[in-house]
Amino acid sequence: VLIAVGWTLRVAGTVLGLAGAVIFRAGFTSDQLPAGLTQALWWLRLLGSGVALVIGAWVFRAGRDFVVGGKQHTADIIDSFDGLRGTRYLLYLRPFSTDADMASLPSEIAGGGSDENVFFASGLTHEETLVRRFRNFGRVVAIGRPGENLPLPGAARAYLPLDDWQDTVSGLIEGAHVVMLSAGPGPGTVWEFTEALRVLPPTRLVLLAYCDRAAYDRFREAVAEEYARRSRTEPGAPGTGRWPPLPVLPDFPPPFRPERPRWEVWLNGGRSRLRWDFVLKGLVVFGPDWRGDFIRFDPTTLRLPNAVTLRRLVRRELRPVMDQLTRLPTA
């Protein structure tokens, strides 16, 4: 019911908002401007269309929130991890502190743009977008945040106790076709990375950079400390008992063009659009020798960033990653 109501509100808000935007802009064409800007009808039309645009945007956003709420009630929940044995699944690991951001909806289309572009923003949460991108490789599963009332849309959720989770997560990592781990300096995430390093072939690990450079650098430092501690006190890889060498995590790449010429700023309608960045800044994939490669989705490489060129950029940068994952043997 919530999903149906949400879609109804989305459509109604889009129609109302776009109609208001069109009428508002039309009021400023040369043949519509009244002499001296004194005609009451012109002012009423301008006010009414502006109100319609604002109300339409509000209804549209409310509709999207209703859809997300409905998806939470119909989300995929895993009752037992035993059912995953022998199946092909992708394990999505992340700091629980990022759940609110990952469950949010994009407020604009890729690259930003005019106000009415909000009506064309995706109705998928950031986690749903991630799951949709990789779901062809297997079912995407995640550990649910302890204490949450409803699972978030996206990966199928299973729940673990707060004080007894590491052995289960280790088994899930070892059995996963691919592990997608969102970088973050928290102790749980850092332990999960070192555990993936211990039990997983390097080509099965994908490190997601939803964070900025500072958080990524803190993650690298925390990983080095945790690796030093665990490699001294705990057994290494199954079968050999030895820990693989700690991989050198690549630097977070700086923008390709941090400064833009004035003509590009003018052509893009100001600096705000040129400051736009992806929520998923990039990802790190590893070769057989644990050599990491940071693939940055960098909008500054484009002179005219827009929804089409940005989509092509991501698809182009992801192609070698998808090829590597396609070649993986079944776990």
What is the predicted function of each stretch?
Residues 153-176, 186-198:
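TIR-domain catalytic/interaction hotspot
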